[in-house]
Amino acid sequence: MTPLSIILVLISALIHSSWNFFTKRGNFPIEFFFWVFLWGTFLYLPFFYFSGLFPGLLLQATPKLWTLSVISSLIQTLYLISLIKAYQMAELSLVYPISRSAPLFTQVWAVLLIGEILSITGVVGIGLVVVGIFIISMSDFRLTAVFHPLRQTSSPPYFFALIAAVTGSVYSVLDKVCVQMTHPVFYCWLINLFMCIELGLYALFQKRNILIKVWGQWKKEIFLIALLQNASYLLVLVAMQMSKVSYVVAFRQAGALFGAGLGILFLKETQWKTRMTGALILTIGLILIGLAK
């Protein structure tokens, strides 16, 4: 990875862990994110207005870009719904290590679909990142804790967490393809637009009046998370233009380091020795990815 892409992904990971932290504390329903992505479409309007790029980007958008953007947004919507359902059904220690295993799947799709060639150093680094995340999520070092998520493979939360991991890896590869075809800001705006429509339709099929209730209850939180989510996503898209998507997705798991720190400091989580061990392994993995070609 290039030094600039590493910096961008680290900043993105910090922002990502922050908005995830607020989301977990708030226990927001899926309808909350309709408003997040609606606000996301408005956040980019000043950039388009002052830069004057929007008409040109709109005219240059190919049918392939539109098609892949819609597919990516649908997959991201499925990812978001699956992740929220998983967190609603089970404890974090079961869902987190499975849902954050996306780097393992991403390298498979990246090799098969877009022909990325990964170095041995990079592959080992990705493996250590996943192991580090798994250990961070453990309650302790007993064998029962190690195999706890694996014993739940037939449970609905496991299924939704696995769906989140797979869909997260697929849309990341699609993002990589799309940002090679257009400006990252325009693509990010498209994703916000399409996901807003998709989540709006999903909400209407659930309860017709819930969107108004969600807006009335969480106005400030909606705007804050829209700002943080879009900043994090945009930085990753820019990094994808410079580096391999397999490395970017794996390096983004640095957010687990920040998340563990936030959990210990503000949520008073225990088992800091387990967290620190996982964080050390994760850090070694990140260093290897940073050195990988």
Report each predicted region and the residues it spans.
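Membrane-interface interhelical linkers
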Residues: 1-23, 27-71, 77-90, 138-160, ...
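Hydrophobic/small/kink-forming positions within alpha-helical transmembrane segments
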Residues: 13-17, 45, 73-78, 103-108, ...
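Small-residue-mediated transmembrane helix hinge/kink sites in multi-pass secondary transporters
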Residues: 24, 84, 110-111, 176, ...
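Specific alpha-helical transmembrane segments that line the substrate/conduction pathway
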Residues: 71-76, 87-136, 188-197, 245-265
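Membrane-interface helix caps and helix-loop-helix hairpins in membrane proteins
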Residues: 115-119, 177-180, 241-242, 292-293
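C-terminal appended segment following the main domain
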Residues: 229-293
